[in-house]
UniProtKB/Swiss-Prot annotation:
This is AP-3 complex subunit mu-2. GO terms for cellular component: AP-3 adaptor complex; AP-type membrane coat adaptor complex; axon cytoplasm; clathrin adaptor complex; cytoplasmic vesicle; cytoplasmic vesicle membrane; early endosome; GABA-ergic synapse. It comes from Homo sapiens (Human). Keywords: Cytoplasmic vesicle, Golgi apparatus, Membrane, Protein transport, Transport. It is a peripheral membrane protein. The lineage of its organism: Eukaryota, Metazoa, Chordata, Craniata, Vertebrata. The keyword Protein transport applies. GO terms for biological process: anterograde axonal transport; anterograde synaptic vesicle transport; clathrin-coated vesicle cargo loading, AP-3-mediated; endocytosis; intracellular protein transport; intracellular transport; synaptic vesicle coating; synaptic vesicle recycling.
Amino acid sequence: MIHSLFLINSSGDIFLEKHWKSVVSRSVCDYFFEAQERATEAENVPPVIPTPHHYLLSVYRHKIFFVAVIQTEVPPLFVIEFLHRVVDTFQDYFGVCSEPVIKDNVVVVYEVLEEMLDNGFPLATESNILKELIKPPTILRTVVNTITGSTNVGDQLPTGQLSVVPWRRTGVKYTNNEAYFDVIEEIDAIIDKSGSTITAEIQGVIDACVKLTGMPDLTLSFMNPRLLDDVSFHPCVRFKRWESERILSFIPPDGNFRLLSYHVSAQNLVAIPVYVKHNISFRDSSSLGRFEITVGPKQTMGKTIEGVTVTSQMPKGVLNMSLTPSQGTHTFDPVTKMLSWDVGKINPQKLPSLKGTMSLQAGASKPDENPTINLQFKIQQLAISGLKVNRLDMYGEKYKPFKGIKYMTKAGKFQVRT
C-alpha cells in the first residue's frame, strides 16, 4: 500500500525518507513542491496529489510535511490517519516532533517506522506495543548503544500482542495509581464587523494520562453528552455502550493517549468568549488613517482569558503605523504589512486597547475592504461548549486511584472582520 515516506521541512528540503517496497526517486516530490508553491499557506497544500504513476498523500504538523507515496488507489483517509499516527508516535517517543529531534534520533525513527508498517501495510500502531518492540531513547541507553553497538530493539515479544487487549501490556505496576483527563477545546469562528457570529465551531479532544496497576476497567460519564457530534474514539472504547448509554467504557492503554476527539457545530449555539471593538478608517486623498481596537471578555463564565495575541494583515497602502497599546507590546513590519499585538491577560476592569494612526501612501485609493483581525487566546478550566465530566469509576481492581479533570479552551482560526 504505502511504498515510501518523505519528511519535508517548511523550506522544501527532504531531510528523511523511508522505503518499504521499492525505492521511489525523490523526483516524485516535485509534484508536491509545485502544489506547495501554489498554496498561500502550508495548511492549504492539497492532502491528495495525483501524479502520472503515483499518488502523494500528506499531512502538515509541527512545521513538517509527512508525504506518503502510493501506487494503487486506497481510501485517502486511511493513509492520512496513519500519517497522523506516525506523528503522534514520534511525539510520544521523543516528547516533541521536530526536524532537529528526528535527526538526532534517526536510528530509532527508522526502527519505529519499520515496525509500524509491514511491506507497506500498517501493523503495529499502538504506542504501548511499539515501546516494547523499540525502547524509547534515553541518555544512558544512547551512550550504551554507542559503546556496545547494540540497538533499541527489544529482545522479547510484546505481551500486549498476545492479549485480548492489544493496546495494553500486561503486568503493569505503579506505586502511585493515577488517572488524569484533559478536555481541550479549540474554537473556530468568523465574526462580522457588527459583532454578529457568521460561523462558529468547536473541535475538542480528551487526552488521558493513565498510570494504573493491573487491568483496570474505567467508565467516564458526562453531564451533557448529547453536545458531542462526529465523535472519534480510541480503539479501547466500547462503542455499543456509548451508543446505548452515552457512557465511555474502556480498558485504557498505559500512559498517555487520546481517548476521543469530537466536534460541536454551530447548530448548538457555540458561545463566543471574546469580543473586539474596532474603528479602522482609511480616508480618500489623505495620508493618514485611524486605527483603534479594544479586546474584552464575553462569555467566559468568570474565567480569565490568557495568552491573547492579535494579528492583522494591513493593506499594501499602509506605509507605517504609530500606535500606543494600553497593555502589552506591539510590532508592525513595513515590508510584510503585518501588525502583531501581544496582549497577555485580559483584565475585565481595564480592557486592553491599541490606538493610533496609520501613514498611508500618497495618492493611494481607499482599500476595497478593511483588514481582518485574527485572535489567539486560551482560557484555563473552561470548556466553552459546556461539556462537563460527571464521574469516573473504576472496576476490576481494588485500590483507589487519584483522579483529576482539567479543562481548557483555546482559539483556532478566530477571525473578526472590520
